[in-house]
Amino acid sequence: MPREKGRKVVASNRKARHDYSILDTYEAGMALTGTEVKSLRAGRASLVDAFAQERNGELYLHGMHIPEYVQGTWTNHEPRRTRKLLLNRIEIDRLIGKTRESGLTIVPLQVYFSDGWAKVEIGVAKGKKSYDKRQDLAKRDAQREIARAAGRRGKGMAD
């Protein structure tokens, strides 16, 4: 069977972009079992409350939920197990160095298949304060109103 091409998004962490300001992003592979891959291909995953953490010089993804594969038997995986992230040593060292700074953490942003391989997009993030979140919402609403008004003007409708 030929390998699929392109990028197929399985799950995205929209809350991460709301709660954190993303400073830098990386693409990492994941060490998965067979039933985890089958469950991901079925589009079943959740990144809510997931984060990456350093242990013994490696990065691990905690809290990501991949439900058990429906047709799986005794070989099924544990849904919230810790999964190893596959990165180059230079990238791992750079990420570990950044997380040692105060207030920075690593959060997963998306899980997707890239040319048949399961990947996770991780971001180095700094937590937002509540007033930052309110400002972002106000900016987004203002942009939406501007776009709506421009659309009406383009269609010849009066405000």
Swiss-Prot record:
GO terms for biological process: trans-translation. It comes from the Bacteria. The keyword Membrane does not apply. It is found in: Cytoplasm. SUPFAM superfamilies: Small protein B (SmpB). Keywords: Cytoplasm, RNA-binding. Pfam families: SmpB. InterPro entries: SmpB, SsrA-bd_prot, SsrA-bd_prot_CS. GO terms for cellular component: cytosol. GO terms for molecular function: RNA binding. CDD domains: SmpB. The keyword DNA repair does not apply. Required for rescue of stalled ribosomes mediated by trans-translation. Binds to transfer-messenger RNA (tmRNA), required for stable association of tmRNA with ribosomes. tmRNA and SmpB together mimic tRNA shape, replacing the anticodon stem-loop with SmpB. tmRNA is encoded by the ssrA gene; the 2 termini fold to resemble tRNA(Ala) and it encodes a 'tag peptide', a short internal open reading frame. During trans-translation Ala-aminoacylated tmRNA acts like a tRNA, entering the A-site of stalled ribosomes, displacing the stalled mRNA. Belongs to the SmpB family. This is SsrA-binding protein. It comes from Salinispora tropica (strain ATCC BAA-916 / DSM 44818 / JCM 13857 / NBRC 105044 / CNB-440).
